[in-house]
């Protein structure tokens, strides 16, 4: 695998920002899957490659990894600050095409993240479903309005969202409503959360909402907390599921059993 760490100038952010990219050193890069990996609130773009098997998995699946940096922005166009959502969902693919020749064909493009990054990944997929074949969220901040006071210790939520109120375009439960009439494509989802994670109940509620809409999704849960041990395991499962098995089924997994529902 080739590994690149670069700083690019972003018009959306009004500043230079870091991006990590890994690319297979064999095979046809034009046909390689592209996986965006989004970091969590207390981490940065290095976490995925420092603490998980991400690069090994990318090699196994012949995939390109793109890992951006977003600070503590919740992947949002901030009320008082940079436009991080515009950067991730619109500008970053253009920058990767310009500098690396990466062509993110929707049928082979995936976005995944943990915690805050899981929220960001799903927000991207729900907002622009035509851009992604699949999406994965691990221990995601599913109910962002309820979690903000606990997560934002310096009250940065006031800078991200006006008056600390999450608007519909930034709320996952509001975003999925547009899919109810069946006219929007539903990217395949892989959702995972540890049973001891404080975000587990909210992830169950999101899972139930999506299942009621017959969303093509995989749900994985196992004993585990909000940590890299669980996310490393979940990443391997998600990449195998999404990159190898793009079927027409909704699959529900537990640590011990799996059932497949047409």
Residue ranges and their predicted role:
Residues 1-262:
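Non-catalytic cap/lid and distal C-terminal segments of serine-dependent acyl enzymes
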């Amino acid at each position: 695998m080739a590994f690149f760490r670069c700083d690019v100038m972003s018009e959306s952010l009004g500043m230079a920002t870091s991006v990590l990219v890994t690319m297979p050193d064999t095979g046809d890069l034009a046909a390689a899957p592209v996986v965006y990996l989004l970091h969590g609130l207390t981490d940065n773009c290095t976490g995925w490659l420092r603490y998980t098997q991400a690069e090994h998995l990318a090699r196994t699946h012949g995939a390109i990894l793109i890992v951006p940096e977003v600070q503590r922005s919740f992947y949002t166009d901030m009320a008082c600050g940079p436009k991080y959502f515009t950067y991730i969902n619109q500008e970053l693919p253009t920058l990767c095409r310009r500098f690396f020749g990466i062509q993110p064909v929707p049928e082979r493009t995936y976005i995944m993240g943990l915690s805050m990054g899981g929220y960001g990944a799903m927000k991207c997929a729900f907002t622009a479903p035509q851009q992604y074949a699949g999406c994965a969220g691990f221990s995601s901040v599913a109910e962002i309005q309820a979690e903000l006071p606990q997560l934002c210790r310096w009250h940065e939520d006031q800078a991200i969202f006006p008056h600390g109120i999450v608007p519909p375009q930034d709320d996952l439960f509001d975003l999925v409503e547009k899919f109810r009439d069946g006219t929007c494509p539903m990217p395949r989802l892989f959702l995972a959360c540890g049973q001891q994670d404080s975000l587990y109940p909210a992830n169950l509620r999101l899972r139930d909402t999506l299942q009621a809409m017959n969303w093509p999704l995989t749900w994985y849960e196992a004993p585990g907390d909000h940590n890299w041990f669980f996310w490393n395991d979940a990443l391997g499962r998600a990449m195998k599921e999404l990159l190898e098995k793009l079927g027409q089924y909704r699959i529900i997994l537990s640590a011990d059993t799996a059932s497949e529902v047409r």
